[in-house]
Amino acid sequence: MTELPDNTRWQLWIVAFGFFMQSLDTTIVNTALPSMAKSLGESPLHMHMVVVSYVLTVAVMLPASGWLADKIGVRNIFFAAIVLFTLGSLFCALSGTLNQLVLARVLQGVGGAMMVPVGRLTVMKIVPRAQYMAAMTFVTLPGQIGPLLGPALGGVLVEYASWHWIFLINIPVGIVGAMATFMLMPNYTIETRRFDLPGFLLLAIGMAVLTLALDGSKSMGISPWTLAGLAAGGAAAILLYLFHAKKNSGALFSLRLFRTPTFSLGLLGSFAGRIGSGMLPFMTPVFLQIGLGFSPFHAGLMMIPMVLGSMGMKRIVVQIVNRFGYRRVLVATTLGLALVSLLFMSVALLGWYYLLPLVLLLQGMVNSARFSSMNTLTLKDLPDTLASSGNSLLSMIMQLSMSIGVTIAGMLLGMFGQQHIGIDSSATHHVFMYTWLCMAVIIALPAIIFARVPNDTQQNMVISRRKRSL
């Protein structure tokens, strides 16, 4: 890093700030949801749409971000991403209704979807290959700090100012980042193939419509027949994409990816696994505040051990997988996460609050080991020619499954709470207990998929990926 020119180091700082903004926003909002609900005059049971709208938009826009950067230029797209993210933050802070806030989060999600992948692409273009690993470590470090600061910072801002400030703090950072990007970042472009617009639209429509159909009756009052039509339309869009990809060599995601067995298993397991684990960052601060009566600040502090456990586990997960193999690790961590989530609920309802940080630390460790194992299992055997496409598809599936997980969690709360829950009451405890029991089952189910993964540790090494060609 020290041998790099000054202008390159400044460019890396710009990318790092983009990573920080995007990652901070993934956790800072969750702590503020109950306060947002009170301010906007909404039931806390509807506030999951604030999270879903952002994450689903990121999932939809991710496939287009790399192509746009290659075609229009990394500086132009990164600048646009920061501007959109900052404008979205401003509109979020100015929102007076839930619908306005959801629309503003969609705009914010468009910027967030382009910020991280285009940032990675920028590093690839400005840094020599020999220093790429060090550069990526540098720019992703703020992305690891963001989720750690998010819950506590969100709690402080909500408790001592208002929820609007969790979005307003993005504005000065965004303005400085946009100006620095425009002045300092080169606008690299390359020749690229024609963008698969029909495939992109089919996938986008399918993902958005299916997610809407999953929760439309509770959040939007859509009739059952309309929901059935939406579900059928979303499924038809996905099937049409598969037909399109089979006939089109330039499809957004080639079906050749699924000729690699570990990719197919890993992708299916990642989708199912992240539906369950995606519920936890949303539900935990909501339960702490509404179910137990914690203040936003204390609820935010409680989330820090989970992030610390996640970061600490990343240092040893490679050795664990190499020692025990993917099947054992994935089955054990999947069932373990379900048990730890039940332990968290039991400890909380028994009033043993002093044990909650320890349980959340353990939850973060188990979840991190499972995430890392799922990611490497999915990508490790792909041919080099398909590695980039496979990584993009995995990133999209990760965001989609998390949005579905939050949607299901909100649906369960609404079903058991019947739209009426009070702060730290016996009835509320029962609502969250039933919700957590259902969540534990959903978290545990992917173990059935992971049980089919080969467990030969030599063939499933994390640190070396076989290079093959189709």
Swiss-Prot record:
Q: In this record, what's one Pfam family?
A: MFS_1
Q: Which InterPro entries match?
A: MFS, MFS_dom, MFS_trans_sf, Multi-R_MdtD
Localization annotation = Cell inner membrane
Give the Periplasmic membrane side ranges.
1-11, 70-76, 125-137, 186-196, 246-262, 307-341, 417-430
Keyword Cell cycle set for record: no
Bilayer-crossing regions: 12-32, 49-69, 77-97, 102-124, 138-158, 165-185, 197-217, 225-245, 263-283, 286-306, 342-362, 396-416, 431-451
Q: Which GO terms describe its cellular component?
A: plasma membrane
What does the record say about its membrane topology? Multi-pass membrane protein
GO MF entry, a single one = transmembrane transporter activity
Cytoplasmic compartment residues: 33-48, 98-101, 159-164, 218-224, 284-285, 363-395, 452-470
Source domain of life is Bacteria
Please classify the protein's predominant subcellular localization into one broad category.
membrane
Keyword annotations of the record: Cell inner membrane, Cell membrane, Membrane, Transmembrane, Transmembrane helix, Transport
Q: Does the keyword Transmembrane apply?
A: yes
Matching entries from NCBIfam families are given as:
PRK10504.1
Q: Which family does it belong to?
A: Belongs to the major facilitator superfamily. TCR/Tet family.
Q: What is this protein called?
A: Putative multidrug resistance protein MdtD
